[in-house]
Regions:
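Bacterial N-terminal signal peptides
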Residues: 20-31
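Residue-identity detector for glycine
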Residues: 8-10, 25, 93
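Interfacial loop-to-helix transition and helix-capping segments at the boundaries
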Residues: 259-268, 304
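N-terminal secretory signal peptides that target proteins for export/translocation
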Residues: 1-18
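N-terminal periplasmic/intermembrane-space "pro-region" immediately following the signal or transit peptide
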Residues: 2, 34-119, 423
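Outer membrane beta-barrel
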Residues: 95-251, 267-272, 276-286, 348-359, ...
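Active-site-proximal beta-alpha loop/turn segments in soluble metabolic enzymes
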Residues: 244-262, 294-298
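Outer-membrane beta-barrel pore domains
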Residues: 121-123, 168-173, 181-184, 193, ...
Length: 423
């Protein structure tokens, strides 16, 4: 209530000062020509000087009042706000705190999904499911410093909800050529892992490509550390770089969380280097590659240098989307043990027809039996067919059929439906 009264008093005061400035200005405009027609005396000159000083004083008071009041908050269009949220460059405004200081304001988005899944795999049951509930927040601390947080609520294998801080970043971006971040981030391996995070509403398909799965995929999804990214002066080629260094993945105990949030199990650090191009001549096209290196020290096993190389070529136009990626993981053991290579790839194409977007994906993974981290994947491949229908700007319903062929195992056919939304 007191805030409302103070705000009303400030508004009335600004109105009174503005009225005084206007009346004084009108008086000056009327008086000045008359004074110019005759030889001005000392008294007239003194009167004009005082009036000018009064106007300047009133203008100064108006400026001080405006600075002391909270600036109006910008309300961007919902669609533009959401699209920038996934690119991690949304910045919030500031407001005046009750104590008179300026406090940052968080820009908040929620993403969620519910669905149904059925398959002919013997161990599966048809089930309604509640997917991830994603709380995405950003806040500007200064013009170049911001915080990003992504907290996900999801059901575990025991049907109990667990809460994970999927991303927590403090980012400094003084210019388009440098952005430095520290905290927990999605590794920039390939395209999909940084283009699509934990909000299913952004994704065309219901499921992620297997090699980018949150659990059981080919790449480390998260890491804790420092990264730098930005543009490379390259004219119309549109080059961008990224460099990351972090704790890497846990390997000593399979029961532990893979992402080493609080302590690294060894002194070695993982690093990732990537380069991509967005040529102006081909709008919507991006090609790039990345190399990730980590040293794993599993218990009762040989030390392993794991190198992950990823390459992608994607096109995202107004209607047409075509994603192509390949990932190769080479595990070199520092002992008389054979090295292993695991490869995964996928292609996904879709096209918008009004509110409808049919899509097709084909994926292939050939995991080495000598690699304990991936051997359960084996050889698997198959197509995915689906249809997405946008229900306005903030919700989409999806239906998907997937056929999965596995080496020495029965083929699995599955049907999945999903309602994804943001609010």
């Amino acid at each position: 209530m007191w805030c409302l009264i103070a705000h009303g008093d400030g508004a009335r005061r600004r109105t009174a000062i503005a009225r005084s400035v206007a009346l004084t200005g009108v008086w000056l405009m009327l008086a000045w020509p008359a004074a110019a027609q005759t030889q001005p005396g000392a008294a007239d000159q003194e009167t004009v000087r005082r009036l000018i000083e009064r106007v300047e004083e009133l203008e100064r008071q108006v400026r001080e009042l405006r600075q002391s009041q909270a600036p109006p908050l910008d309300v961007p269009s919902p669609q533009g706000d959401l699209s920038s949220a996934n690119e991690h460059n949304t910045h919030a405004g500031d407001v005046t705190s009750p104590g008179g200081g300026v406090s940052p304001v968080a820009d908040i988005h929620w993403f969620g999904d519910v669905g149904f899944r059925a398959s002919d795999q013997q161990s599966d049951t048809s089930s309604f499911t509640v997917g991830q509930l994603d709380l995405f927040l950003t806040s500007s601390l200064t013009d170049h410093l911001n915080v990003l947080s992504e907290i996900v609520f999801r059901a575990g294998a025991d049907n109990r909800y667990v809460v994970n801080a999927e991303r927590l970043l403090l980012q400094y971006a003084p210019n388009p050529y440098l952005r430095v971040g520290v905290g927990r981030y999605h590794t920039a391996i390939g395209f999909y892992n940084t283009a699509y995070h934990h909000g299913s509403w952004f994704e065309t398909a219901i499921t992620r490509p297997t090699m980018f799965a949150y659990r059981g995929g080919l790449i480390p999804i998260h890491d804790i550390g420092v990264f730098a990214s930005g543009r490379v002066p390259s004219g119309t080629l549109g080059l961008k770089y990224v460099f990351e260094i972090g704790n890497g993945q846990s390997s000593q105990n399979p029961a532990n969380e893979a992402t080493q949030n609080s302590a690294d199990e060894n002194n070695g650090k993982a690093f990732n280097v990537g380069l991509s191009a967005n040529p102006e001549r081909f709008p919507g096209l991006q090609v790039g590659f990345s190399t990730h290196r980590d040293r794993l020290k599993p218990a009762n096993a040989a030390v392993t240098d794991q190198t992950t190389i990823a390459a992608h070529a994607v096109y995202q136009g107004t209607a047409l989307e075509w994603l192509n990626e390949i990932v190769t993981v080479r595990s070199a053991r520092l002992a008389p043990a054979p090295d292993s290579v695991t490869t995964g790839l996928y292609t996904q194409v879709s096209r918008q027809f009004g509110q409808l977007r049919p899509y097709f994906r084909y994926q292939y993974i050939n995991a080495s039996a000598a690699d304990a981290a991936f051997r359960t994947l084996g050889l698997r491949h198959g197509p995915t067919l689906g249809l997405r229908r946008d229900m306005g700007k903030f919700a989409a319903v999806k239906a998907q059929y997937e056929r999965l062929k596995r080496r020495a195992m029965p083929t699995v056919n599955s049907l999945t439906g999903q309602l994804a939304f943001t609010f």
